[in-house]
Amino acid sequence: RACLARRLAGHWPGIDQETAFTLGLFSLLDAFVDIPLKHLCEKLNLSDSLKNALMRRAGGLGQLLTLVQKLEQAEWDDLDWYALEQIGLQADVISSAYVDALNDARELVEALA
């Protein structure tokens, strides 16, 4: 999720790629530590934009996280393709970002092994 968020952010105006990576990473943190995401956001020193994206799917980061989750779950019919194309995220760009993110994640896991 973090790798895909970072890849998509590279095509999303106004969203920093490393912030997007952090967003994707932290969006799954509650599953790893068995603490509700709300409590984690209160304890961690995150920017307001990250907190709002994680808790309410607000702002551009929230929209990005929603997109990443829909892509993960293959909810293609729920995507607003016209809106995505307006910001430069055509289907081929998204497809390439997805494949690149899978490769990034594999390389990351291999580097940690």
Predicted regions: what is each one?
Residues R1-A113:
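Metal-dependent nucleotide-binding catalytic modules
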